[in-house]
Amino acid sequence: MKLENKKGYLYLEDGTFIEGYSFGAKGIKVGEVVFTTSMNGYVESLTDPSYKGQILIITHPLVGNYGVPEKKYEQGILTNFESERIQVEGLIVAEHTYPSKWNSALTLDEWLKSENVPGVFDVDTRMIVKKIRTYGTMMGIIASELEIDDPRKYLEKKYDEIDFTQFTSPKSPIFHPNTGDMIVVVDCGIKHGILYGLYKRGFSIVRVPCSFSASKIIEYNPKGIVFSNGPGNPNLLENQIKTFSELVEYKIPILGICLGHQIATLALGGKIKKMKFGHRAINKPVIESNSNKCYISTHNHGYGIISKNDIPPNTKIWFYNPDDYTIEGLIHEKLPIITTQFHPEARPGPWDTTWVFDKFRTMVTGK
């Protein structure tokens, strides 16, 4: 389907120029070009704050066929979106189509337009993904209806050099009251699926900006602390790493997820490195070291613990990926700290590892 036959373009920093057709909003956006192999869940993926600053390629050839539903909330938590708005800078797909589903409120094209996000379709996504898989992620420009004379001037600032949590973290605390123990979520750009997983286990939740100091967090007298997912390079987050290090002294149970896992690793003395093209999919295997069980899990990260030699002292490997042997979770041997690089809440994806939230609840409540 060629919407109005308007041209759209993707420029890659290696000089590759790709021409397709434009849909969504008009304009120019810059970002790191990454891909997900997820076959569904584009609503959740596009609203995942971990994608802030990135242009997303969806490898599944047909996108948009079930449309975009209306937002649904429970206690201020979205139950079918991962944040209030689209987070990606742009979207690249092979084919875009109109929806046929009973609960569709908008087409994908209408949704992108309403949130000022450009898209390009009718391009060879397989070729682009093979290039990224071979040479690694790279910066790119997505543009509609116009060609860019000098793309290099748009690509001077690299993704790794920007703290994107400044765009995804809340500006002030947000409360989600419940009947259970109070926990603090250090919100670097949390997926609402994580919030919902915690809320359904009875926790009263206060989300605080990720710039909050340890002393401010302790003022809430939390029984547990969660460091959330979020976008960007964790090695830039000196304040958050310092905050985690100081919170460790209180011996309060801590759960780190995705970026939170990376912050924990750095705060405890480990190393986080850039991956060649990352893990972005809803069918990634992880093996739990204690039981040797394999779980299928949802991933969205471009940084990680690449080798077992990079784990912090006094921690042991909780999960690892059998495809590339990157480390997918840690347990501290002396402190009540657990982390997962993957997303136990899924959304989208399988629910194999939602029990991680139950383990954290046991750490907090003692039962």
Curated annotation (Swiss-Prot):
UniProt keywords (A-Z) are: Amino-acid biosynthesis, Arginine biosynthesis, ATP-binding, Glutamine amidotransferase, Ligase, Nucleotide-binding, Pyrimidine biosynthesis
GO terms (molecular function) for this protein are: ATP binding; carbamoyl-phosphate synthase (glutamine-hydrolyzing) activity; glutaminase activity
Reactions catalysed, as given in the entry:
hydrogencarbonate + L-glutamine + 2 ATP + H2O = carbamoyl phosphate + L-glutamate + 2 ADP + phosphate + 2 H(+)
Domain Glutamine amidotransferase type-1 span(s) in chain numbering: 182-367
Question: What is the recorded function of this protein according to its Swiss-Prot or TrEMBL entry?
Answer: Small subunit of the glutamine-dependent carbamoyl phosphate synthetase (CPSase). CPSase catalyzes the formation of carbamoyl phosphate from the ammonia moiety of glutamine, carbonate, and phosphate donated by ATP, constituting the first step of 2 biosynthetic pathways, one leading to arginine and/or urea and the other to pyrimidine nucleotides. The small subunit (glutamine amidotransferase) binds and cleaves glutamine to supply the large subunit with the substrate ammonia.
Q: In which pathway does it act?
A: Amino-acid biosynthesis; L-arginine biosynthesis; carbamoyl phosphate from bicarbonate: step 1/1; Pyrimidine metabolism; UMP biosynthesis via de novo pathway; (S)-dihydroorotate from bicarbonate: step 1/3
**What does the entry list under GO cellular component?**
carbamoyl-phosphate synthase complex; cytoplasm
InterPro entries named among the record's database cross-references:
Anth_synth/Amidotransfase, CarbamoylP_synth_ssu, CarbamoylP_synth_ssu_N, CarbP_synth_ssu_N_sf, Class_I_gatase-like, CPSase_GATase1, GATASE
Q: Which Gene3D superfamilies match?
A: 3.40.50.880, Carbamoyl-phosphate synthase small subunit, N-terminal domain
Family assignment from sequence similarity: Belongs to the CarA family.
Write down the EC number: 6.3.5.5
Q: What is the lineage of its organism?
A: Archaea, Thermoproteota, Thermoprotei, Sulfolobales, Sulfolobaceae
- The protein here is known as Carbamoyl phosphate synthase small chain
Entry-linked SUPFAM superfamilies: Carbamoyl phosphate synthetase, small subunit N-terminal domain (SSF52021), Class I glutamine amidotransferase-like (SSF52317)
Using the UniProt annotation, give all residue ranges assigned to the region (CPSase): 1-182
Subunit architecture: Composed of two chains; the small (or glutamine) chain promotes the hydrolysis of glutamine to ammonia, which is used by the large (or ammonia) chain to synthesize carbamoyl phosphate. Tetramer of heterodimers (alpha,beta)4.
The record's top EC class is: ligase
